[in-house]
C-alpha cells in the first residue's frame, strides 16, 4: 500500500461510520476525501420535520447508552426514553385484563429459558427456537417484536445466534433534536456530496474510485455503504473482492423497518410516550413521543417490504392497526401521514439495517476483518461483533476501528484522544 499520509484515504459514504472514520483520520493528520452519494450527510440517521417537531426517519435511539460512544461524545443532555415510556396492551380491541398482562409478562420472562436449548446446537432460526412457546397466546407478539420490529426481519429468517448476540438490553437515550440532526451536527466534517462511487479499482498499489465527478485516488479506501448496495452490485470492484468477502456481504442482507408519522390534534386520552401494542397486531406505535404532536408507527420484515413502494398502502395499514388498538372513533383525531420512511426503495441503502440468517452470524466478523490488499476496509453497522450491530453506536465504532487499522500500518501511527 502507498503511504496514507502522503496519498491519503478515500472514505466512501458519509453515514455515521464514514463520518467517524474521516474525523479520526483527519485528526491523525491523514489527508482524507469523504464522498457521499446523497446531497446530505448522516446516512440512515436523518431527522424530518413534523409540525415543527423532529421525527427520525431512521435511527431513533442511542441504544446501550452505557457503552455507546455517541452518548459519551454528546455535548447536550440526552433524554432517558426508558424512564418516560408506558405500555398500553390490547387484546381483540380491548385493554388487556390484569390476568392477561400477568401472562404477557410471564411469557416475556420465559423467553431466555425457551431458547437456551437451541443455543447449544447448530444455528437455527429464532422462530424455530421459540417453537416451544407455540400455543402461548402471547408468542406471536413476542416473535413479532424480536423479529420484524427490532431486527427488521421476520423470525423465520433471523438466525438465532445473530439475534442472541445483538439483543439490546442496556438503557436508551435520545437527543432532543433527533438522532439524525444530532449526528449531522456532532460529527460534521467536510464531504463531497452527490458523488456516488461507481467503481473501485484496487489493482494497483493504491485505489482509484470512479465517480460521476471524476476519478479520486488514494492510498486506501474505507467502504461504508450498506451490504444491500454492495450485494446489488451498485459498486463495481476491480479486481473482484475475495470470495470470503463476497460471501460475508451476501450473508448479511438488509432487513426493513418502516416508520410513519401520523400527526394528531387530539391526544386521545393517551399520555406522552405510550407504547401501543396489540396481541394480534402487525405494528407497534409510540404515541406522542416526548410530548410531540404525532404518533410514530413501526412495521418491519415482510409486511414492510410488501408496502415499501406504496405509501398509500403503508398509511392504510397503519390506520387499520390504530383502529384495532384504539377504536374507529380515535382515527378522527389522526391526520394524514406527514412522513413515511423509504429505506427499502432508496437506491443508496436498499434496506434499513443488516441481519444474519441461520448459520451466518459469523459473517459480521468476516466483513469487519476483511482487508483486501491492505487497502480496502469495510465499516458500518453490519460489521459489528460486540452486540451493537444495527445501531448508530456500532456504526461509529466500526468507522473508528477501520481508520485505526489504516493508521496502524504507519510506523508511529496513533489516534487523537477523542477517537478511541
Functional labels for PLM-detected ranges:
Residues 1-420:
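FAD-dinucleotide binding site
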Amino acid at each position: 500500500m502507498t503511504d496514507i499520509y502522503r496519498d491519503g484515504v478515500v472514505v466512501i459514504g458519509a453515514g455515521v461510520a464514514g463520518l467517524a472514520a474521516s474525523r479520526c483520520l483527519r485528526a491523525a493528520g491523514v489527508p482524507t476525501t469523504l464522498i457521499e452519494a446523497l446531497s446530505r450527510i448522516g446516512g440512515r440517521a436523518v431527522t424530518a420535520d413534523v409540525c415543527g417537531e423532529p421525527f427520525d426517519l431512521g435511527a431513533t435511539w442511542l441504544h446501550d447508552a452505557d457503552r455507546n460512544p455517541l452518548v459519551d461524545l454528546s455535548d447536550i443532555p440526552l433524554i432517558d426514553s426508558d424512564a418516560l415510556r408506558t405500555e398500553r396492551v390490547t387484546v381483540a380491541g380491548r385493554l388487556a385484563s390484569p390476568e392477561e398482562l400477568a401472562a404477557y409478562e410471564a411469557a416475556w420472562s420465559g423467553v431466555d429459558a425457551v431458547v437456551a436449548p437451541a443455543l447449544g446446537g447448530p444455528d437455527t432460526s429464532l422462530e424455530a427456537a421459540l417453537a416451544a412457546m407455540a400455543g402461548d397466546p402471547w408468542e406471536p407478539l413476542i416473535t413479532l417484536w424480536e423479529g420484524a420490529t427490532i431486527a427488521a426481519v421476520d423470525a423465520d429468517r433471523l438466525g438465532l445466534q445473530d439475534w442472541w448476540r445483538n439483543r439490546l438490553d442496556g438503557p436508551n437515550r435520545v437527543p432532543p433534536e433527533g438522532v439524525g440532526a444530532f449526528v449531522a451536527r456532532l460529527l460534521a466534517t467536510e464531504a463531497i456530496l452527490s458523488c456516488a462511487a461507481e467503481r473501485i479499482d484496487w489493482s494497483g498499489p493504491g485505489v482509484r474510485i470512479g465517480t460521476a465527478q471524476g476519478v479520486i485516488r488514494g492510498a486506501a479506501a474505507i467502504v461504508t455503504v450498506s451490504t444491500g448496495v454492495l450485494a446489488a452490485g451498485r459498486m463495481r470492484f476491480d479486481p473482484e473482492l475475495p470470495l470470503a468477502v463476497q460471501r460475508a456481504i451476501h450473508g448479511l442482507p438488509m432487513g426493513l423497518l418502516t416508520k410513519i408519522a401520523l400527526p394528531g390534534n387530539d391526544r386521545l386520552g393517551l399520555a406522552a410516550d405510550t407504547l401501543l401494542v396489540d396481541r394480534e397486531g402487525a405494528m407497534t406505535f409510540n404515541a406522542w413521543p416526548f410530548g410531540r404532536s404525532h404518533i410514530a408507527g413501526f412495521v418491519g420484515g415482510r409486511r414492510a417490504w410488501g408496502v415499501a413502494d406504496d405509501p398509500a398502502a403503508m398509511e392504510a395499514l397503519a390506520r387499520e392497526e390504530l383502529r384495532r388498538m384504539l377504536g374507529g372513533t380515535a382515527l378522527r383525531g389522526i391526520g394524514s401521514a406527514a412522513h413515511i420512511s423509504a429505506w427499502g426503495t432508496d437506491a443508496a441503502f436498499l434496506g434499513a439495517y443488516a441481519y444474519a440468517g441461520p448459520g451466518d452470524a459469523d459473517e459480521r466478523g468476516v466483513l469487519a476483518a476483511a482487508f483486501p490488499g491492505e487497502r480496502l476496509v469495510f465499516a458500518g453497522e453490519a460489521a459489528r461483533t460486540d452486540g451493537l450491530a444495527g445501531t448508530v453506536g456500532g456504526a461509529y465504532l466500526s468507522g473508528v476501528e477501520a481508520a485505526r487499522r489504516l493508521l496502524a500500518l504507519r510506523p508511529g501511527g496513533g489516534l487523537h484522544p477523542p477517537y478511541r
